[in-house]
């Protein structure tokens, strides 16, 4: 039976019921709905609606119900209840009789669903924080294991300057740390309870909403009943954090997809995260990474859909807001899966140090070092830049790397170039000069690795 049937003399059309009902997806809020109901029953005792004995019976019944749905949440879906709130209430009435009908006193589904959703977001957020940390740990471990590997750095997908594999991996550790911080911020902002706000104007019972909030694990209660039932900022914020983090993961995936190509050959993916072709027996496709890249659009699209659902929506609850859950659930599930899959990819990733070194030494990646050498000889950088550009054109024509040009060839472009130029063009010298904080010098990368290992261990411990 619908919770609102008394007003109606005609039953709902079956097509409308199917269109309107949300149990098929909001059943995922069962644990949170029961948790909130347990706290609400205690609050009703304090205002004289329930006796302590009645609350005890409800508590016992809800504990049994909670254990049941934790063991088999799919059981909920065989019901024809409109939503998870209706299902929980019906289950309680079946367990304790008319006493179950008293539980909804002073409460609306509007503040109830807002509370359930926030409780779910808090729990899911903690899982996501753990998955971000696990991926960061995987990146740091991979960086440590391949610390010696030199990697060509790219701009515009053209070889630019040499970096190291460890420096590359640590770049994603930094991106993920910002994601971690943004998620923490979003979780902090949503950590207020709307329960007790009623449909929109507040409850008619003198509920201690602060105590109620603390009982459910919130930091406090919301301040305005109308805002509380209208608010879905936390949904949008979490979807935004997911979208941005997925964008970072898509860049990580694209880098490794490119590094894994036959043309690059910098890394080899494990058989465990790749698949083959039904036609071409030689193929080993980076499906895990391609799916991470592809699923980014799915998560970003969910955020855009939620924003459009909220656009120009009048205050208080409107049925449009039922559209918040499917997109949120899917976005956070997808983000969680992709974080875990990225960590799995790293476990058995092999770095081909010989190929990365050869690539880093090619493409005139030491041209900037020659320009810096000329600056040290007193030539203004802009002029030095022009001289080196002409030198590179010549080197390409004669098919030589810069370090193999003779002094005579160098001096065709600048008479200040002497034999001391050659040590400056060596790859390790190129790395060693990047000693400023955040640079690619070996000691800087080691310091960054130690720092990341330290704070990740502290967080995990």
Curated annotation (Swiss-Prot):
Catalytic reaction(s) noted: 2-(N(omega)-L-arginino)succinate = fumarate + L-arginine
Main location: cytoplasm
Keywords attached to this entry: Amino-acid biosynthesis, Arginine biosynthesis, Cytoplasm, Lyase
GO molecular function, one term: argininosuccinate lyase activity
An example Gene Ontology biological process: arginine biosynthetic process via ornithine
GO cellular component terms attached to this protein's record: cytosol
Localization (cell): Cytoplasm
Protein's pathway: Amino-acid biosynthesis; L-arginine biosynthesis; L-arginine from L-ornithine and carbamoyl phosphate: step 3/3
SUPFAM superfamilies: L-aspartase-like
The keyword Disulfide bond belongs to this UniProt entry's keyword annotation: no
Keyword Cell wall biogenesis/degradation: no
E.C. code: 4.3.2.1
Similarity field: Belongs to the lyase 1 family. Argininosuccinate lyase subfamily.
Matching HAMAP family: Arg_succ_lyase
PANTHER family assigned to the protein according to its UniProt record, in alphabetical order: ARGININOSUCCINATE LYASE
Designated name of the protein: Argininosuccinate lyase
Organism phylogeny: Bacteria, Pseudomonadati, Pseudomonadota, Gammaproteobacteria, Aeromonadales
